[in-house]
Each structure stands twice: as C-alpha cells, then as structure tokens.
Amino acid sequence: MGSSQSTPKVQDANADAERIRKAQHSMAAAGGGSQCPLTPEQRAAASGENCGAGGACPVGADKASINPLNNELEHPNQKPAPDQPFALPTKREKSTIPKAGTETETWTYPSPQMFWNAMLKKGWRWQDDSLSKSDMENIISIHNANNEEAWREVLKWENLLHPECAEPKLKSFKGDAKNLSPRARFRNLFLGYDLPFDRHDWIVDRCGTKQVQYVIDYYDGGAVDPSSKLFTILDVRPAVNDIGNIWDRMVVAYWRFKFETLGFTPSLPIPPTEGHNVNH
C-alpha cells in the first residue's frame, strides 16, 4: 500500500502556496491594487515630482501625471526600493480587457516592480511575508488571472441582460478592501459567510449609453492549488446604486430561483455569477 505522507516536494509546494496566500491577504489589507493613493489635498499641492525610489507616491505630483481612471502615475515608478531583497521584472503584460475610450486598446497590468513599490507605499511590510522573487512573480500572475476571470464574469451579466451592446469596455477601477459591500456584510452577519479579503469596484462603459458600476468581492476559497497558486473565489455583480442595476439583479435572482431551485428548464443560456462558487 502507498504511503499517505506527502513528499518533501509536495510539502514545499504547499508551503509556497500558503505563503503566497498570506501575502495576498496582507497586501489587500494594506490597500490592494497597484494604484498610488493620493488625497485631494495632495493632488491640489501638485509640483511635478515622480514616485521616489522607495515606491512612495508623490505628495505633490503633477495633476496631469495622474491617471484618474486607475489613480496611477502616467509614468509609474519602476525603480527598486532601497531595502528590496531581490530584483524584479519591469515588463508589463497586456490584458484582454478592452479599454473604454479606445478602438482596440486593452488595459496593461503593472509589472512586478510596480506592484512591489505600490504595496510598500500602502504600508505593506515585505519582511513579514518572507517572499521570494518567485513568490512575487506568482502573486502578479494570480492578480492578472483574477482580473481576467472578473472580466469574464462581467461579460456574462452584460451579454445576458444587455446584448444590444456588442462590446462593453472597462473605463476605470479601484481597490477598496476596507469598504465592505452591503452584500458581504449581510452574508457575514446573517448567513455565516466569511468576509471577503478584498474588494474592487469597476466602471464598465456599455457602448457609450451608460456607465455601470460592478462590485467584485474576493473570497478565500480555502484550498490552494499548489501548481497555479490560485485560491480566490470571486463574487461579481452590478452595484445596487441605480434602478437599472437593481432590476438586473432582481431578474437574475428570479431566474436562478426558477431554474436552479425549482428545476425548470431550459436553464439560463449564460449562467449569471452572483455568488458563483462562493460555498461555505
């Protein structure tokens, strides 16, 4: 009979995966995302400096140098921080997410170096997470994969409920881990769900006819895949800040009850993802 004990290689892979999960939680708690956070007062005091070598965002950055769509410097800091323990790539990858206001352009992800610098600025302490260069690159891969998955979930809502717009595009986004959504609070208080460890808000341009806010809650799915390091479960849905969004969510809730609870057929042509895979 085979041994039930895991091999050292498997144990190392599991340890790497757990370390990466812990780091992602602490990064989200520090602010999440890759933006340089600036207060209105700091923006008003603009003086044209760039982010320093340590990843600090300028107290007086030129207003024109800040992209209001992602609160990121137009020429972001790619220099290593003074106490950085290893070099990180500065190459940025293109996403598949179409960018509003352009014909064919897509959003570009931050490089590992940009991500590191932004996290330091938000108060993250890399010493607490003992990350390696490989860990950091895996975190970037997970970050990008989560964004791609979130966009696919947005498209399920848009394609099902608003097929008149052939190509919705992402206009802007921000991370806001400390601002729990009403849905997340309700699930935690009354249904016993864990709280999400991160939250993002995306503004989607619906072919120029409307700008729609989507809320994305990031839940810890428990088991970490040792190969992909993925562990996040996404809850993607329109925000309840507009009568149209509320109606869309009511329609989807009705369809889910009709087809999934009562067992009516046919099922939804594109399964909506409100609460998709968030199992507790």
From Swiss-Prot:
InterPro entries for this protein: Holocyt_c/c1_synthase
Record region (Disordered): 1-95
Pfam families: Cyto_heme_lyase
Enzyme kind, highest EC tier: lyase
Catalytic reaction list: holo-[cytochrome c] = apo-[cytochrome c] + heme b
A single GO cellular-component term on record: mitochondrial inner membrane
EC number: 4.4.1.17
Compartments in which it is found: Mitochondrion inner membrane
UniProt keyword list: Heme, Iron, Lyase, Membrane, Metal-binding, Mitochondrion, Mitochondrion inner membrane, Repeat
Source domain of life: Eukaryota
Major site of localization recorded for this protein: mitochondrion
Ranges of the HRM repeats in the UniProt entry: 35-40, 56-61
UniProt GO molecular function: holocytochrome-c synthase activity; metal ion binding
Functional summary from the UniProt entry: Probable lyase that catalyzes the covalent linking of the heme group to the cytochrome C apoprotein to produce the mature functional cytochrome.
Family: Belongs to the cytochrome c-type heme lyase family.
Protein name as catalogued: Probable holocytochrome-c-type synthase
The organism of origin for this protein: Caenorhabditis elegans
Gene name as annotated: cchl-1
